[in-house]
Amino acid sequence: MVLISLKRLERNIYYIEIIMTKLTPFHLAIPVKNLSESKDFYENILGCKRGRESNEWADYDFFGHQLVIHVDPNHEGKSHHNEVDGKSVPIPHFGVVIPWDDFDKFADMLSTNNIHFVIEPYVRFEGLPGEQKTMFFYDNSGNALEFKSFKDMSMLFSTKI
């Protein structure tokens, strides 16, 4: 991944900061109630490509990371909630940071597929360091997902609130 940002040294003097990073894909295994229904969600709604599978689990390319869905018919999908920017955020949750210019199209695609948002797409920390678009929804097994996008990707790990 290449992060590019314009930095100001002093009045009318700017430089371009280029940060080269190589992300190591993460692995996440989550419980699902029904394997067939969950395959449909991750493949046909989120567009994830299926890899290896058995009768009890399936691997997915989740935006370059490895997501494994495992059958747990007793999974209740309950979550705790914490307040962030005045919104009740489901905990735990997982997701992906997508490009700023793709966020609205992705949100529209989810709406077209009748995905109910727990937190509707909106801009969080508007005008502040770490300004981002975010949205939360559940998969068909009650696992909370967050998709977000940063206006300035170099602020992904900002310590300023």
Report each predicted region and the residues it spans.
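N-terminal amphipathic/basic-hydrophobic helices that include classical n-h-c signal peptides
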Residues: 1-19
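N-terminal beta-strand motif that seeds the catalytic metal site of vicinal oxygen chelate
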Residues: 13-36, 93-94, 149-161
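Short secondary-structure boundary/capping segments
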Residues: 20, 50, 58-59, 83-86, ...
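A generic structural signal for short beta-strands and their flanking turns/coil linkers
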Residues: 24, 56, 65, 90-92, ...
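Vicinal oxygen chelate
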Residues: 25-33, 61, 81-161
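Core segments of cupin and vicinal oxygen chelate
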Residues: 31-76
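A short, polar/proline- and glycine-enriched secondary-structure boundary/capping micro-motif
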Residues: 78-82, 156-159
